[in-house]
């Protein structure tokens, strides 16, 4: 089997993990205590779900996941929550004091005390796998644990499991809503450190998700639970092809092959449709063409940026539910003709398509309507550089005055790391800019 191990780091990672595992359990008919009643066995013994769950002798299904946080309160909620029997107690690893929004604490002082137990647990999980495919790491950019500890973990995973792919699901600091003043510092330090270790990073911007919840689901004041349930649908769409048998299945390495043209340009933009409340869904058709079209609306993106200002390098459409290739081809053909989608000229307009016949599942009592079909689009576009530019600008404003830097230096970091990280980000922006330049322009320059 091609197993995946999920690692959930820090408060954001753990809470995303809660939502995701809740959804996986519903999708596979696994009860909160890990049992799978025989009448619920889907499709008469489709065992693809073993990529994410391992089965014990007693017939219990245990997620292949590790939850880590440097302080216990968030993980304690799992220990006392409805899914407490699902996880092995040693899969929930907590420290005593938190990283206090400080990258240096997560990466150096406090992180290094907890990294070995975490790696031991990951080693035990990987020993249970017959053919480990890779890791999915969930975290935020802005928090201390999410930024600092994740980058430490990614470095160590690269050493221990060099050839395995590592995908990240990262919560990008929202442009308007901020949970910490030092988010730009943490984000840039973690991006710099994990850039060479991560194979593919799906970014999710809280503000974009807030807006989707407000606009499409009519939730006036979305809570993190609302946000995480929406995020979990996206994660589920991306991983569905690993967990179910499908017509056109996509595995982890296939994502990278199709979405990442250059090692550093590995930040695809995710878009999901239809995000719709039950009241509205009843009155709408939501055909393949409609949901495919919706993916090209900036309003449905997980990161605030405008793909109309950028160019696409690759595009991957993952359908699930009642979808046939004929409809998909028609929808894509329509988009190619009428949408102003600009691809870079060195990449012919390729759309990679995955189809999975398992319809999307919704959490009972959740906000999303039960629909027959859904689509998740992953596109690698140069527009995401806008997100980096915003972050870099905020970093510059603070760093020019060396504001808050003493907290980092006090935990054993050197000031040089800041400027080094910032230079790396400048290089990343430049990389994005160069990828978007038409190749025939380069040839003219060479002749002069």
Swiss-Prot record:
Pfam family, one: Tubulin_C
Keyword terms: Acetylation, Amyotrophic lateral sclerosis, Cytoplasm, Cytoskeleton, GTP-binding, Hydrolase, Magnesium, Metal-binding, Methylation, Microtubule, Neurodegeneration, Nitration, Nucleotide-binding, Phosphoprotein
GO molecular function: GTP binding; hydrolase activity; metal ion binding; protein kinase binding; structural constituent of cytoskeleton
Post-translational modification, as annotated: Some glutamate residues at the C-terminus are polyglutamylated, resulting in polyglutamate chains on the gamma-carboxyl group. Polyglutamylation plays a key role in microtubule severing by spastin (SPAST). SPAST preferentially recognizes and acts on microtubules decorated with short polyglutamate tails: severing activity by SPAST increases as the number of glutamates per tubulin rises from one to eight, but decreases beyond this glutamylation threshold. Glutamylation is also involved in cilia motility. Some glutamate residues at the C-terminus are monoglycylated but not polyglycylated due to the absence of functional TTLL10 in human. Monoglycylation is mainly limited to tubulin incorporated into cilia and flagella axonemes, which is required for their stability and maintenance. Flagella glycylation controls sperm motility. Both polyglutamylation and monoglycylation can coexist on the same protein on adjacent residues, and lowering glycylation levels increases polyglutamylation, and reciprocally.
Modified residues (Phosphoserine): 48, 439
Residue numbers bearing the Phosphotyrosine modification: 432
Obligatory cofactor(s): Mg(2+)
Protein name as annotated: Tubulin alpha-4A chain
Residues with N6-acetyllysine modification: 40
Free-text note regarding domains: The MREC motif may be critical for tubulin autoregulation.
Catalytic residues in the record: 254
Subunit relationships: Dimer of alpha and beta chains. A typical microtubule is a hollow water-filled tube with an outer diameter of 25 nm and an inner diameter of 15 nM. Alpha-beta heterodimers associate head-to-tail to form protofilaments running lengthwise along the microtubule wall with the beta-tubulin subunit facing the microtubule plus end conferring a structural polarity. Microtubules usually have 13 protofilaments but different protofilament numbers can be found in some organisms and specialized cells. Interacts with CFAP157.
Residues that bear 3'-nitrotyrosine: 83
Effect the entry attributes to changing residue 215 to C: In ALS22; displays significantly different distribution in terms of incorporation into microtubules
Chief localisation class: cytoplasm
Homology family: Belongs to the tubulin family.
UniProt motif MREC motif: location: 1-4
Residues that coordinate or bind GTP: 11, 71, 140, 144-145, 179, 206, 228
Organism this protein belongs to: Homo sapiens (Human)
Effect of residue 320 to C: In ALS22; displays significantly lower levels of dimer assembly
Binding-site list for Mg(2+): 71
Catalytic activities: GTP + H2O = GDP + phosphate + H(+)
Known disease link: Amyotrophic lateral sclerosis 22, with or without frontotemporal dementia: A neurodegenerative disorder affecting upper motor neurons in the brain and lower motor neurons in the brain stem and spinal cord, resulting in fatal paralysis. Sensory abnormalities are absent. The pathologic hallmarks of the disease include pallor of the corticospinal tract due to loss of motor neurons, presence of ubiquitin-positive inclusions within surviving motor neurons, and deposition of pathologic aggregates.
GO CC terms of this entry: cilium; cytoplasm; cytoskeleton; cytosol; extracellular exosome; extracellular region; microtubule; microtubule cytoskeleton
